[in-house]
From Swiss-Prot:
<keyword id="KW-0479">Metal-binding</keyword>
<dbReference type="InterPro" id="IPR012001">
    <property type="entry name" value="Thiamin_PyroP_enz_TPP-bd_dom"/>
</dbReference>
<comment type="pathway">
    <text>Quinol/quinone metabolism; 1,4-dihydroxy-2-naphthoate biosynthesis; 1,4-dihydroxy-2-naphthoate from chorismate: step 2/7.</text>
</comment>
<dbReference type="InterPro" id="IPR011766">
    <property type="entry name" value="TPP_enzyme_TPP-bd"/>
</dbReference>
<comment type="subunit">
    <text>Homodimer.</text>
</comment>
<comment type="pathway">
    <text>Quinol/quinone metabolism; menaquinone biosynthesis.</text>
</comment>
<keyword id="KW-0464">Manganese</keyword>
<keyword id="KW-0460">Magnesium</keyword>
<comment type="function">
    <text>Catalyzes the thiamine diphosphate-dependent decarboxylation of 2-oxoglutarate and the subsequent addition of the resulting succinic semialdehyde-thiamine pyrophosphate anion to isochorismate to yield 2-succinyl-5-enolpyruvyl-6-hydroxy-3-cyclohexene-1-carboxylate (SEPHCHC).</text>
</comment>
<dbReference type="Pfam" id="PF02776">
    <property type="entry name" value="TPP_enzyme_N"/>
</dbReference>
<dbReference type="GO" id="GO:0030145">
    <property type="term" value="F:manganese ion binding"/>
</dbReference>
<dbReference type="Pfam" id="PF02775">
    <property type="entry name" value="TPP_enzyme_C"/>
</dbReference>
<dbReference type="InterPro" id="IPR029035">
    <property type="entry name" value="DHS-like_NAD/FAD-binding_dom"/>
</dbReference>
<keyword id="KW-0474">Menaquinone biosynthesis</keyword>
<comment type="similarity">
    <text>Belongs to the TPP enzyme family. MenD subfamily.</text>
</comment>
<dbReference type="GO" id="GO:0070204">
    <property type="term" value="F:2-succinyl-5-enolpyruvyl-6-hydroxy-3-cyclohexene-1-carboxylic-acid synthase activity"/>
</dbReference>
<keyword id="KW-0808">Transferase</keyword>
Length: 589
């Protein structure tokens, strides 16, 4: 009997070897029969951590979270039929947020296709244009050419997931029976060592992407523009890499004298420098300040800003905009960029900083003075209601409870907006991630679990109740994987963000509640029970902080904070009004 029980075992082993040699370190496997060879190969491959997740949709987002945190491709495995289709939302998010993901879809053999065989659907290019690369690896064959071709194709697929713009790739893998490692002789002796074992310690085909070095002459031109312009801002949108970006942005801001507008998920807001603003959203809602502080030059990094008002301010400023794209994407829907600089954002910052030494002038001091007024007003407004847990206060307290380096995942909709608007930037570095590619609320709990799993430490998720219910099955995933996570769920019994949109003013109240407010009345303690989570229901800021800190010690925790949707709208208006009033008519320096 050969060292591999049968040809399927050999084929799957070789496939997983190439994935690991290409940099994959995590595999997420969903149960299924046709995928048995792949599942067993995942479990038996050295250097690969394998996670078992029952539900494919949860598995896809769990793998996405693994890849977002580790910045290395994760592999996710499904059996034949509709199983792989449940990965579609995660694949879309991976494509739009540039996260490397390898999807393995097991398949029935060619002779069963198109003849009504059970659990058999067309799986070719399952994910359409959302996949960076697709290949059908073909039926396992005991021939050198077939095995070597398969290994080389897998190596190419991994590089395609890694290479900018990063994203998901699909490998379709058909198997005939036997699917279990049952002894079935095949001509192993006729296979070369290269076909059977590949190149030890390296992919069969090593494809080296070009170095992401920004063009020096373009950077020289941008540096000249900076030197000629005092009225500039640095804008940092969503960006997953923690590669020294915060320090590089801090150095650039101090060299240029430009204030920094950094989102929570930019990896530049926490651990940044003295010119990193906390409350630019509130400041720019104040028309006199916004008009007096229109920039002439904008240096943009990462994706587009989540808050609407700052983005409108930028789009309407008429400023010369330079977009730095280190992920291969063009996040410029308003087409304001006159120049796009591709390559490492950190390298670009470092190159621009050399030769610039303007320092902090009147332009930046105007922003800092306004920031201090707004900060004082916000703190006073919160102090008036010291024991009230409003949605803005929840976001603020969650961040305050986190130690340096703590992983935080944030849901789309209101949580990410409240974090940006009401939680101050700080010098303590935090790892903050969100699914801001498609901006959906699906798979949020699963993504956070993947983040925590890759981080190897307890993480915190800040989410709304609808996003939690959308992914409530992830509590089963949490229970089975034993990944430590603290879920802070803002429960306003529905979709709170719709109360801020025009539809809330024009739709009849009953219609609005039925179609948009969507009150559910679900007792979230059942979600906690589903995963064996410890349930906390804090009612004060102090109690919330305590619950989050307890959760960070380990285990699965659900921290439910009940709030009123209508009161939430009033509180946002109260806080923004207080912050705006603090700015007055100027001057602000």
């Amino acid at each position: 009997m050969s060292s591999d029980a049968n040809l399927n075992v050999l084929w799957a082993r070789a496939l997983l070897e190439e994935l690991v040699r290409g940099g994959v370190r995590h595999a997420v496997v969903c149960p299924g029969s046709r995928s048995s060879p792949l599942a067993l190969a995942c479990a038996g491959t050295e250097g690969l951590r394998t996670w078992s997740v029952i539900d494919e949709r949860s598995a896809g987002f769990f793998a996405l979270g693994l890849a977002k945190q580790s910045r290395a491709p994760a592999v996710v495995v499904a059996t034949s039929g509709t199983a792989g289709a449940h990965f579609y939302p995660a694949v879309i998010e991976a494509a739009l947020s540039h996260v490397p993901l390898v999807v393995l879809t097991a398949d029935r053999p060619l002779e069963l296709q198109g003849w009504g065989a059970p659990q058999t659907v067309p799986q070719a290019r399952f994910f359409g244009e959302h996949a960076r690369f697709y290949a059908d690896l073909g039926q396992p064959e005991a021939h050198d050419a077939a095995l070597i071709h398969m290994r080389a194709t897998v190596a190419r697929a991994v590089v395609s997931a890694w290479r900018a713009p990063r994203g998901a790739v699909q490998l379709n893998v058909p198997f005939r029976e036997p699917l279990a490692p049952i002894a079935e002789p095949f001509p192993e002796a006729s296979l070369s060592a290269l076909a059977k074992s590949g190149r030890a310690g390296a992919p069969l085909t090593r494809i080296v992407p070009p170095e992401p070095v920004p063009d020096a002459s373009t950077l020289d031109e941008v540096r000249r523009r900076i030197a000629a312009t005092t009225r500039g801002v640095i804008v940092c949108g969503p960006r997953d890499e923690m590669d020294g970006f915060a320090a590089a942005i801090s150095a650039l801001s101090q060299a240029t004298g430009y204030p920094v507008l950094a989102e929570s998920t930019s990896q530049a807001r926490y651990g940044g420098g003295p010119l990193t603003l906390s409350y630019y959203d509130a400041m720019l809602r104040h028309a006199p300040f916004a008009k007096a502080h229109r920039p002439e030059l904008v240096l943009r990094f990462g994706g587009g800003l989540t808050p609407k008002v700052p983005q409108q301010w930028l789009d309407g400023s008429g400023a010369d905009t330079v977009l730095f794209s280190d992920g291969g994407g063009l996040f410029d829907p308003a087409h304001r960029a006159s120049t796009v600089v591709e390559g490492s954002a950190v390298a670009a910052c470092e190159a621009l900083t050399r030769g610039l030494a303007r320092g902090v002038g009147a332009w930046a001091r105007g922003f800092l003075a306004a920031e201090q007024r707004v900060r004082t007003a916000l703190e006073a407004a919160f102090a008036e209601q010291p024991d009230v847990l409003s949605e803005p206060r929840i976001a603020r307290e969650v961040v305050a409870a986190l130690p340096a380096g703590a992983p935080l995942f944030v849901s789309s909709s209101m949580p990410i907006r409240d974090l940006d608007a009401f939680a101050p930037a700080g010098t303590v570095p935090l790892r903050v991630l969100a699914n801001r590619g498609a901006n959906g609320i699906d798979g949020i709990v699963s993504s956070a679990l993947g983040m925590a799993a890759a981080a190897g430490r307890s993480a915190v998720l800040l989410t709304g109740d609808l996003a939690l219910l959308h992914d409530v099955g992830a509590f089963v995933t949490a229970s089975r994987t034993r990944v430590p996570l603290t879920v802070v769920a803002v429960n306003n019994d529905g979709g709170g963000i719709f109360s801020f949109l025009p539809i809330a003013q024009v739709a009849p109240r009953d219609t609005f509640e039925t179609l948009f407010g969507t009150p559910h009345g679900v007792d979230l303690s059942h979600a906690a029970a589903l995963g064996g989570a410890r349930l906390h229901r804090p009612e004060t800021p102090v109690a919330l902080r305590s619950a989050v800190r307890e959760g960070l010690e380990g285990g699965l925790h659900l921290v439910e904070v009940r709030v009123d949707r209508n009161a939430n709208v009033d509180e946002h208006r109260r806080l923004f009004a207080r912050m705006a009033a603090s700015l007055g008519e100027g001057p602000w320096a």
